[in-house]
């Protein structure tokens, strides 16, 4: 499963909320083991020490449910995606800018390829210019 950089908040929320959790934690009242839960890997990346301690304590004592555990991850992922999506919005609204950027890149690539081929031909003794 993936979360794309331009994923809307509802989809991010849905995808994280439906992530599998500790397979041994069948019921809300069962204590869990964060190390066996894929959501914990996201906490390791996105959560501060205070949230990780809350998850460790809450999960191992069945003090929190899996949905509660996932909410800080959802919030952190959305916060991280927000500036990326804002920058992307500018390009979405102005396709001509995107076309110009691509055209400039193509021109630079052509110039570089032309120089490289000239060097190759010269090295092979095939350059007559």
Regions found by a protein language model. Give the residues of each.
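Conserved nucleotide- and phosphate/pyrophosphate-binding catalytic cores
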Residues: 1-129
């Amino acid at each position: 499963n993936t979360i794309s950089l331009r994923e809307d908040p509802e989809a991010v929320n849905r995808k994280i909320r439906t992530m599998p959790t500790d397979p041994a934690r069948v019921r809300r009242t069962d204590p869990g083991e964060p190390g066996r839960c894929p959501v914990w890997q996201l906490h390791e990346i996105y959560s501060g020490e205070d949230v990780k301690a809350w998850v460790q304590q809450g999960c191992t004592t069945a003090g929190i449910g899996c949905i509660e555990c996932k909410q800080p991850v959802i919030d952190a992922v959305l916060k991280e995606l927000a500036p990326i999506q804002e920058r992307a919005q500018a390009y979405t609204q102005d396709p001509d800018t995107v076309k110009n950027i691509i055209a400039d890149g193509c021109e630079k690539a052509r110039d570089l390829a032309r120089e490289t081929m000239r060097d190759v031909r010269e090295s092979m003794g095939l350059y007559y210019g």
